[in-house]
A protein has these predicted regions:
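Structural signature of PLP-dependent enzymes
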Residues: 151-170, 176-205
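Active-site phosphate-binding strand-loop segment of PLP-dependent enzymes
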Residues: 10-11, 30-96
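PLP-dependent enzyme catalytic core of the Aspartate aminotransferase-like
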Residues: 3, 17, 42-48, 145, ...
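Conserved PLP-binding catalytic core of the aspartate aminotransferase-like
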Residues: 186-243
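Active-site PLP attachment segment
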Residues: 106-149, 153
Length: 276
């Protein structure tokens, strides 16, 4: 069985169910406090049967924007190891949280603990290759024999699924990462985007207050990554789309990265109207 956070990216459930797994959830987001139910999450993971698969967002949790702290990760790793669980780490937004190395540190912690893990990495956002869907699946095994068996099974799945992936996007990523000058430029631009997104979070909070929203929306600035869990209801999100042309999911998730100087005032005014 697979266990995913509540909530998680919708496609996580769809993909695992499509592969024949039973998908369950563990507590994560606390709608009352606007934070994490970490104690409940840890207790739930600690009660899982051995060899259960636990899907964890390595950084920039989608959709909530709330991440586990470094100290909390240590507790999660200890429980995963003690309970003999399999960690599946989804790394879709490396570099958008605190930095490339900082966001990737959790992977090294799992490996240092001697755990066998799966890591799915996406370059679609960090390289602006959204239409190319560039990524990788990395597997850490306990022996060469074990990893050989895993690789064999992966090849069978790939052969019956897509056979060969498109090479264009992967070639772009390889060219950038393999060239020191291009890599430095990419890291600089990614850092600029990270700073811009954080700045837009603050502008969103300030703009909502200026538009007459009396509710404290400062929690938006404590979230990280591309998305924000706004706390808006499904009815409010439907109104935003139908009446004001502002788009987000029915769960209240909004893409902060889509905000800019030209649309921020309209977005804030629209949200203020549906919150009245």
């Amino acid at each position: 069985q697979v266990w995913v956070s509540d909530p998680t990216w919708d496609n996580h459930r769809a993909m695992f169910e499509g592969a024949g797994f039973q998908v369950n959830t563990y507590p994560y987001y606390d709608a009352t406090t606007g934070g994490l139910k970490f104690d409940a999450m840890l207790s739930a993971i600690d009660a899982l049967p051995a060899q259960s698969i636990v899907l964890l967002h390595a950084c920039c949790h989608n959709p909530t924007g709330y991440d586990i702290t470094a100290a909390q990760w240590e507790q999660v790793i200890a429980v995963v190891k003690e309970r003999n669980l399999t960690a599946f780490l989804d790394m879709a937004y490396q570099g958008f949280g605190y930095g490339i190395a900082e966001d990737g540190a959790v992977i090294a912690k799992f490996v240092a603990a001697g755990l066998n893990i799966f890591v799915s990495t996406s370059f679609s956002k960090s390289f602006s290759l959204y239409g190319e869907r560039v990524g990788a699946l990395s597997v850490v095994g306990s022996s060469k024999e074990e990893t050989d068996r895993v690789l064999s099974q992966l090849k069978i799945a790939i052969r019956t699924n897509y056979s060969n992936p498109p090479t264009h996007g992967g070639a772009i990523v390889a060219a950038v990462l393999g060239n020191p000058e291009l890599r430095a430029l990419w890291e600089k631009e990614l850092g600029e985007m990270r700073v811009r997104i954080k700045a837009m979070r603050q502008k969103l909070v300030d703009g909502l207050k200026a538009a007459g929203v009396t509710k404290d929306m400062s929690f938006i600035t404590t979230q990280i990554g591309m998305f924000s869990y706004s706390g808006l209801s499904k009815d409010q999100m439907v109104r935003l789309r139908s009446e004001f042309g502002v788009y987000g999911t029915d769960t209240g998730r909004m893409c902060v990265a889509a905000l800019n100087g030209k649309n921020i005032d309209h977005v804030c005014a629209s949200i203020a109207k549906v919150m009245q």
